[in-house]
UniProtKB/Swiss-Prot annotation:
Name used for this protein in its record: Vesicular inhibitory amino acid transporter
Similarity section: Belongs to the amino acid/polyamine transporter 2 family.
Annotated compartments: Cytoplasmic vesicle membrane; Presynapse
Cytoplasmic face of the membrane: 1-132, 226-265, 327-341, 405-438, 483-489
Any Pfam family: Aa_trans
UniProt keyword list: Cell projection, Cytoplasmic vesicle, Membrane, Neurotransmitter transport, Nitration, Synapse, Transmembrane, Transmembrane helix, Transport
GO biological process: one example: beta-alanine transport
Topological relation to the membrane, as annotated: Multi-pass membrane protein
Entry annotated with the keyword Transmembrane helix: yes
Length: 525
């Protein structure tokens, strides 16, 4: 009897000791230190699960004691293990395999929202990376030669890879070893990387980068509109700055936008028109194939201007900022990788051919916007279509920038820096409308004082494009999935981060130097 009692006391002491060690290990793990052994990590996981179940049971007992309903009437009580709890989410998540896991618009319960196919998702990505900014790629070949062509391929490969690893950061394994979607946006990934010490720092950095990129995109649309109209009608006594003012006057109603229903109707027409314009440019270039200057395509680079070309190429591939939302709205998220592969392969081939053929046609006379090289009769028609596309494309980044600003500064309750832009009836307040108009005017002023399409595009690509497409995805991937990565994945992430950082700094510095030089000499595009 004494032996049996001693044995039970020993077992109890051992169990208490193991749980204490597991809790201590868990405390160090939460502080950022890795557990010493796998057994301790397993012990911490079991202890944490038991602690959650115990607390959940206490809460349920209290609710029942108070007479509050717990679920549907007549329903069977939940069996242990039916509740899937995800640490850090603050709420239970639906079981694995449920459509509730992959919601849209930042909600995990978005199964009632319409989903898109892989083809539709690919069309959205194609619109993002095959936009009118490809018109600046021949200018990148002018300063980069064959290395510029290689960079078009390299940027496609890297952006495709970083898009995939960014989506991988949305998922984690739950207690059952099942991979579930626990995040819904780029901002959520950034916040998870900076938690627990700075839980909102990462999201703010991403928001700032996103706002800069969106506003710079709006500025580029105004710049290219003024540039195209000025070169289409050189005989008119209207300067490029005046054309930019006229374009902005047309865009001023964007300040009154509440949604993009009206604008979205023109998106398909704009995209088709852009493809037609690209075909017309390539057809004209092919008609002059006998005069192509192959000897002008060089292997050496212009050290000062080539970094600007890197920014132009990177900016033409930016799509990472909306990929989490896009993947969350797909009917089959498992097809995301295949969709990314084909869209970036197609973009790489089309961009490479367009840039090379256009440069071979005009060689050293290649301008920042390639349509400015077309003959007068063709140029006017093509440029008018391009201006229409630019003006119809402007509301999309403008509305997105306004939404980010409103959510960051005006709609976070007690944490908001300024009062809400909307009244209780949902109407936009007068000062909120004033701020929107001020944003439109700001894009105009930037377009007037910095009317250099390629330099602005290179600056934006080097600053926010490289950050959102190269630096942050690789850094987040290493931070969130470090323990699961293979050695070659770690190598790729580190290499992309280092190369992206060098290209970003170099391109940013040289773009600024180019803008300063152009401003001093009062050069016009």
């Amino acid at each position: 009897m004494a032996t049996l009692l001693r044995s039970k006391l020993s077992n109890v002491a051992t169990s208490v000791s193991n749980k204490s060690q597991a809790k201590v290990s868990g405390m160090f793990a939460r502080m950022g230190f890795q557990a010493a052994t796998d057994e301790e990590a397993v012990g911490f996981a079991h202890c944490d699960d038991l602690d959650f179940e115990h607390r959940q049971g206490l809460q349920m007992d209290i609710l029942k004691a108070e007479g509050e309903p717990c679920g549907d009437e007549g329903a069977e009580p939940p069996v242990e293990g039916d509740i899937h709890y995800q640490r850090g989410s603050g709420a239970p998540l639906p079981p694995s395999g449920s459509k509730d896991q992959v919601g849209a618009g930042g909600e995990f319960g978005g199964h009632d929202k319409p989903k898109i196919t892989a083809w539709e998702a690919g069309w959205n990505v194609t619109n993002a990376i095959q936009g009118m900014f490809v018109l600046g790629l021949p200018y990148a070949i002018l300063h980069g030669g064959y290395l510029g062509l290689f960079l078009i391929i390299f940027a496609a490969v890297v952006c495709c890879y970083t898009g995939k690893i960014l989506i991988a950061c949305l998922y984690e394994e739950n207690e059952d070893g099942e991979v579930v979607r626990v995040r819904d946006s780029y901002v959520a990934i950034a916040n998870a990387c900076c938690a627990p010490r700075f839980p909102t720092l990462g999201g703010r950095v991403v928001n700032v980068a996103q706002i800069i990129e969106l506003v710079m995109t709006c500025i580029l649309y105004v710049v290219v509109s003024g540039n195209l109209m000025y070169n289409s009608f050189p005989g008119l006594p209207v300067s490029q700055k005046s054309w930019s003012i006229i374009a902005t006057a047309v865009l001023l109603p964007c300040a009154f936008l509440k949604n993009l229903k009206a604008v979205s109707k023109f998106s398909l027409l704009c995209t088709l028109a852009h493809f037609v314009i690209n075909i017309l440019v390539i057809a004209y270039c092919l008609s002059r194939a006998r005069d192509w200057a192959w000897e002008k395509v060089k292997f050496y680079i212009d050290v000062k201007k080539f970094p600007i070309s890197i920014g132009i190429i990177v900016f033409s591939y930016t799509s990472q900022i909306f990929l989490p939302s896009l993947e969350g709205n797909m009917q089959q998220p498992s097809e995301f990788h295949c969709m990314m592969n084909w869209t970036h392969i197609a973009a790489c081939v089309l961009k490479g051919l367009f840039a090379l053929v256009a440069y071979l046609t005009w060689a050293d006379e290649t301008k920042e916007v390639i349509t400015d090289n077309l003959p007068g009769s063709i140029r006017a028609v093509v440029n008018i279509f391009l201006v229409a596309k630019a003006l119809l494309s402007y509301p999309l980044p403008f509305f997105a920038a306004v939404e980010v600003l409103e959510k960051s500064l005006f709609q976070e309750g007690s944490r908001a820096f300024f009062p809400a832009c909307y009244g209780g009836d949902g109407r936009l307040k007068s000062w909120g409308l004033t701020l929107r108009c001020a944003l439109v005017v700001f894009t105009l002023l930037m377009a007037i004082y910095v009317p250099h399409f390629a330099l602005l595009m290179g600056l934006t690509g080097s600053l926010t494009g490289a950050g959102l497409c190269f630096l942050l995805p690789s850094l987040f991937h290493l931070r969130l999935l470090w323990r699961k990565l293979l050695w070659h994945q770690v190598f790729f992430d580190v290499a992309i981060f280092v190369i992206g950082g060098i290209c970003s700094v170099s391109g940013f510095v040289h773009s600024l130097e180019g803008l300063i030089e152009a401003y001093r000499t009062n050069a016009e595009d």
